């Protein structure tokens, strides 16, 4: 097997142990207090609840790999009724000998195009770039969509810039000053990922840091400039090549939107929305 990197975060570990200790202590002290027990015993995050109907706008997909031994693809959607971001994920373990060789951009592209979801057996490649109507769909507390075959999916149009008018009125998507809180909070539950829609016509100030193994770039539309970055990895190889191409002098300048993950100190690109389509440029 391939050797795995192991990362240890003392603060996260201490927080988990502290929460376990404090919760167990309070449970033992309040065995007859039903109200307190209800607050202490948190519902399972993986529980999914069924909703009769919902309308979604695809925002692209990107590949990922964890240090704990998993890899996969996550597609992002804007849930119109709740004005929130939802995800649909396809994943598998890469610590088995027969799956390690699949962790390449080429094989993940096949996974993006071939694996099917929901009643109409649509692929992530198609779902992530389309407007959808879902019936009897399942969603959990972390805004993750279930791949249940009981869900009925009706695909309407390809997503283009013209579909973003409503999304751009949502502060969480258009206001870049709204970022995830980087300060530690014992009582804060894990929050869903935050996305941004960044307008740009071209990229500038592209540089690759050999020391950090990270690409830095600026998204500009002639009026505003927004900085982003992307760490190098085998899965990000195609994306970095695409971003470098967009920074070349000969690249046509036209209106686009970069869908980005918000981080406290940077923006990480996911996909590009143009006047004609969504470009899942990692694949």
Residue ranges: model-predicted function:
Residues 1-283:
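Helix-loop junction hotspots and adjacent acidic micro-motifs that serve as functional foci
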């Amino acid at each position: 097997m391939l050797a795995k990197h192991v990362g240890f975060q003392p603060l996260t570990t201490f927080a988990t142990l502290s929460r376990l200790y404090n919760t167990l202590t309070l449970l033992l002290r309040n065995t007859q207090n039903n109200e307190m027990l209800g607050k202490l015993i948190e519902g399972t995050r993986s529980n999914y609840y069924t909703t009769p109907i919902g309308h979604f706008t695809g925002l692209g997909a990107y590949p990922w790999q964890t240090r704990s031994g998993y890899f996969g693809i996550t597609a992002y959607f804007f849930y119109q009724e709740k004005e929130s971001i939802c995800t649909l994920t396809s994943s598998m373990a890469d610590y088995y000998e027969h799956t390690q060789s699949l962790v390449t951009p080429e094989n993940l592209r096949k996974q993006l195009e071939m694996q099917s979801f929901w009643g109409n057996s649509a692929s992530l490649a198609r779902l992530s770039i389309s407007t959808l109507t879902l019936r009897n769909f399942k969603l959990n507390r972390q805004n993750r969509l279930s791949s249940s075959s009981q869900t009925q999916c009706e695909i309407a149009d390809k997503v283009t810039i013209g579909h973003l008018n409503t999304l751009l009125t949502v502060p969480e998507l258009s206001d870049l000053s709204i970022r995830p809180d980087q300060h530690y909070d014992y009582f804060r539950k894990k929050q869903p990922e935050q996305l941004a829609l960044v307008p740009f016509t071209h990229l500038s100030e592209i540089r690759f840091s050999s020391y950090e193994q990270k690409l830095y770039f600026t998204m500009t539309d002639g009026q505003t400039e927004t900085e982003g970055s992307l760490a190098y990895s085998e899965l990000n190889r195609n994306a970095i090549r695409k971003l470098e191409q967009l920074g070349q002098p000969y690249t046509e300048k036209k209106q686009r939107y970069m869908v980005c993950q918000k981080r406290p100190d940077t923006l990480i690109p996911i996909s590009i929305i143009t006047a004609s389509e969504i470009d899942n440029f990692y694949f």
